[in-house]
Amino acid sequence: MAETTVEKLATEVGKSADRLVEQFSDAGIKKSKTDSVSEAEKQQLLEFLKKQHGGDSAPTKMTLQRKSVSTLSVGTGSDSKDVKVEVRKKRTFVKRDPAAEAEAEAAAKLEAEAKAAAEAAAKAQADAEAKAKAEAKAKADAEAKEKAKANAAAKAKTAPTAEEKAAQDEADRLQAAKDDVAKAKADEEAKAAAEAARILAEENSARWAEEEKQRKELEKNVDHHVTTSSEARAAEDTADANAEKRDRRPRKAPAAAPANAPANTGKGKRRGGKDNRRDSRNARGGRNARNNRSVAPESMDHAFTKPVAVVKTDVSIGETVSVAELASKMSIKATEIIKQMMKMGSMVTINQVLDQETAQLVAEEMGHKVVLIRENELEHQVLADRDGNIQAESRAPVVTIMGHVDHGKTSLLDHIRMAKVASGEAGGITQHIGAYHVETDNGMITFLDTPGHAAFTAMRARGAKATDIVILVVAADDGVMPQTIEAIQHAKAGGVPLIVAVNKMDKPEADPERVKSELSQHGVMSEDWGGNNMFVHVSAKSGEGIDELLEGILLEAEVLELKAIREGMAAGVVVESKLDKGRGPVATVLVQEGTLKQGDIVLCGLEYGKVRAMRDENGRSVTEAGPSIPVEILGLSGVPSAGDEATVVRDERKAREVALYRQGKFRDIKLARQQKSKLENMFANMTEGEVQELNIVLKADVQGSLEAICDSLNGLSTDEVKVNIIARGVGGLTETDASLAAASNAIMVGFNVRADAQARKVIESESVDLRYYSIIYQLIDEVRDAMSGLLAPEFKQEIIGLAEVRDVFKSPKIGAIAGCMVTEGTIKRSAPIRVLRDNVVIYEGELESLRRFKDDVNDVRNGMECGIGVKNYNDVRVGDQIEVFETVEIARSL
């Protein structure tokens, strides 16, 4: 390797040779221009220059800062406030200078050497001192031995004479005799004291044992802690009283006391008690503590005794009770009940309402005795207060006509009643329960006509519950349908006999045998086939078989032996209810027993009232209605729910109390069912914000239609779109409904009702979407369409063209240009593309240029050649395929 001289190094670094020689000299290296430079010298010069210009490679000082933010909850009264706490930490690291480190290491080394030398010198000195001490000790021992020998010799020389020894012995004997006398006297005194102590112990042993027992009990039960002033004062009084009792006990008078000495009286002892109390207070730091001598108090134990066992109480629990109320009854904290409920697997809050069974389990689990209270005692008393000793009489059968929609139920009833009801129904389908009674030659029959539409399940269930016989209408040309099967299930669930009316027998395509065969698959067997169900072939249009059907109904009723109390207080069931604008709440009641009269007090579910007017199914006013008679009653406090029991009571005030109690109970039960803390609801709430909601304000003419519409609309809800009925009711659309719909961005839906003038003004000013319907089909279909508009759209990619690369050209401006032949569809300049090689997508992007010959074009059709430049992609090869596609939005529907 060639040597590097100073001149050559100066040429490489771009400096003059003289300047480089000076820098070498400053770095402590003596060089001339012709001298060679080694790598070590180069490195030494470089380090010198770095230090001189402050260009060290690594920083000598580094500061790290750390900041953490936390939240502290601070309670202020009943509220809590979150305070942010920010903690900042700063730490600085300093890198020492290598020269300083070397100096420090040298100094430390010198210090260690000096320390080692000092330790060696100290050790040598200690060894010398120990050796000197050992020599001095040996010398002292030798001197002591010599001195002892000298003393023994001197003693031997000066031994006592015989006379001196005898005198000494006599003195010792006299001293021993004196000691024996003193010892005997002390023994006698000790025996006397022991005898006195034994006598005192025998006299007071029982009392001392009792006091010791009480003291141990106090120590066991009393929890020592800092007491309040009132507790300390009470403890002092107790201690003073005990001290006075002890002082009043008779004691033996001292022998040295004079005969005329004044005896201590109770009064004086009382003063002593006060003095003791004062001394105790002074010891605590009372007002006279500075002027009196401090005396330790006798006792600071307070009078409270800590309970050592669980206090078991009788807990009275009603039908519903909140967690806070239950804790108050058990005299414990609500948190204890919450902990117990968590152990039992249920998450509750302090204000949550528990049902009676749950509260009973919790209370019994915590060791308390439970007393169940029936809060509806007044309700039982009111309903039990009936007219007695009344004989039951035969009554007319209640017949419910059920079947699939458009199978001719209402038309059949029209022919029986000789009236036109079906023509008055919107769309020709029944949307209410119609209650009618018909007088025949053989007796009276009450008919309930139920809707056959799928939405009216609850109505059909109520009809089957309040009926005696079910007539199942099946169209001979249509056969068994879904609502036909549902009607069979309702009849079987209610245990009601079933009569099958095969309708539309006048049609040429009627096939009654097919109907029998299909019904037999669902457990309905004809009497001709050995079953128990009567089959009657009828035609609502021609009247064929109507008389046979009525005879079959009356025959079945005679077999059932239907009886009811005709006189006395009435009871029945609400078949239908609505809110009439002119008449108020109107309820259709089917009387089941007794006689309902105008002026009676009626308790109807959550509502009550006095019957102000009664109308029959034809709209005529009546004053009374017996068993199996349907009537409309006016005068209730509100619209009752269809299916509620209607009962006549004696006292309007008690009826009001029962109605209010039922309303509160209904509200409590509703709250008890809202378990928001359940795990399954937790996951449902996590995706709640992703679901679109269609808000609806719904009003209908009758309660039954309202229930049916609500059930149908709620059934339309999906995972993506939810129907939210924010308000519903019976009656016309009011200004309040319109304001609510405007505030919540809801659709107003009126089913056989209209909006009043004030509501229309709000609807026009707020541009609220208002829709009227009279047929439930149309309502459900339009709501479904509105929900479809809220669905997130789907996007689909459609291939619109395919080109094959035949050759590749290079362009200096664009890059690789693919000469292509369009084999399918059309190549568009604005559409995105994919590059395929061996039918595998290798690139996805967009076109940069599209030319035919030398002209820029927007599209190239099938069978034509073109030049394609792919943006940001140059790896186009012969044989590749360029696929052009576009994204198409597809509207979704439910």
Curated annotation (Swiss-Prot):
Binding-site positions, GTP: 403-410, 449-453, 503-506
Chain spans, region G4: 503-506
InterPro entries linked: DNA-bd_dom_put_sf (IPR009061), EF-G-like_DII (IPR053905), EFTu-like_2 (IPR004161), IF2_assoc_dom_bac (IPR013575), IF2_II (IPR044145), IF2_N (IPR006847), P-loop_NTPase (IPR027417), Small_GTP-bd (IPR005225)
Pfam families: EF-G_D2, GTP_EFTU, GTP_EFTU_D2, IF-2, IF2_assoc, IF2_N
Region G5, annotated ranges: 539-541
Gene Ontology MF terms in the entry: GTP binding; GTPase activity; guanosine tetraphosphate binding; translation initiation factor activity
Ranges where the record places region G3: 449-452
Primary location: cytoplasm
Region (Disordered) location: 52-81, 93-301
Keyword field: Cytoplasm, GTP-binding, Initiation factor, Nucleotide-binding, Protein biosynthesis
Record-annotated tr-type G domain positions: 394-563
Record keyword Nucleotide-binding present: yes
Region of interest called G2, as start-end residue ranges on this chain: 428-432
CDD domains linked to this entry: IF2_eIF5B, IF2_mtIF2_II, mtIF2_IVc
A GO cellular component entry from the record: cytosol
Annotated localization: Cytoplasm
PANTHER family named among the record's database cross-references: TR-TYPE G DOMAIN-CONTAINING PROTEIN, TRANSLATION INITIATION FACTOR IF-2-RELATED
Biological function: One of the essential components for the initiation of protein synthesis. Protects formylmethionyl-tRNA from spontaneous hydrolysis and promotes its binding to the 30S ribosomal subunits. Also involved in the hydrolysis of GTP during the formation of the 70S ribosomal complex.
UniProt family annotation: Belongs to the TRAFAC class translation factor GTPase superfamily. Classic translation factor GTPase family. IF-2 subfamily.
Protein name: Translation initiation factor IF-2
Top-level taxonomy: Bacteria, Pseudomonadati, Pseudomonadota, Gammaproteobacteria, Alteromonadales
